[in-house]
Amino acid sequence: MASAEGVRDLLGLLAYAELVAFFRLSEDAALAPSLSDKAALGGMAVAEFGHFQLLRDEIARMGVPPEQAMLPFVGPLDDFHARTTPSDWLEGLVKAYVGDGIAADFYRAIAELLDPPTRQLVLDVLADTGHADFVTSRVRAAIDADPAVAGRLALWARRLVGEALAQAHRVAAERAPLARLLAGAVSSPDGPGGEQGEIGRMFARLTDAHDERMAALGLAGWERVPEAEAPGPG
């Protein structure tokens, strides 16, 4: 069973991530090219804030001030977003899809170790708000209209994966209770490399789902194609 400290760290991390997602989607909504897109993203932002409120309330129920639980993760998450500022609306959409997808896989793996009510809370918070379908349809439409953007977006997605995993390693290295929880989600910490070795293997497996997301976006196979030379797939 997960330790109380590990659960607190997980919920604090997820709560701050949901709060940041609310801010990010609100910004994306302001940049959206049409009123319907603005409204759709605005609705998704509201859903993310609702997720944050659920987590905040659960942390408070545990007897921990929510701000105290979130504070250790402000630096790593803010650093990730500072290092991956999108240059346009499409890059913002890809960032949300790729980054949120890796994070969701990460949280779902850990949720298996939680008590049933907390596990269900995490899964409810991770439920798709319609953002995945929204992003894939817009990115695919943009590629159909201008195939040259595919190479740029694919390289951007690859960079996002590297940055996301680097910050996840940082969090695991700095927060021992969370590191033990992560190690328990994949194997025994007695294996080669101890807890950090198990965590590294977990992160390696998380990249497998990235290939599926790239295919869903229509970006599979584009990472090595310079934008100026990209005539279109096939």
Please provide the spans of the model-predicted regions:
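A contiguous pocket-lining binding segment that forms or flanks enzyme active sites
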Residues: 108-169
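Basic/polar, acidic-poor N-terminal "presequence/leader" segments
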Residues: 1-35
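Extended alpha-helical coiled-coil scaffold domains characteristic of the BAR superfamily
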Residues: 93-103, 210-213
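Extended, helix-rich structural scaffolds rather than catalytic motifs
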Residues: 148-234
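Helix-loop segments that flank and shape redox-cofactor active sites
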Residues: 21-42, 84, 100-117
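Acidic/His metal-coordination segments adjacent to aromatic residues that form catalytic metal sites
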Residues: 1-12, 73-96
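Alpha-helical scaffold segments that form or flank carboxylate-/histidine-based iron centers
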Residues: 5-13, 35-50, 89-93, 117-131, ...
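Conserved alpha-helical segments that form or flank metal/cofactor-binding pockets of metalloenzymes
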Residues: 44-71, 137-139
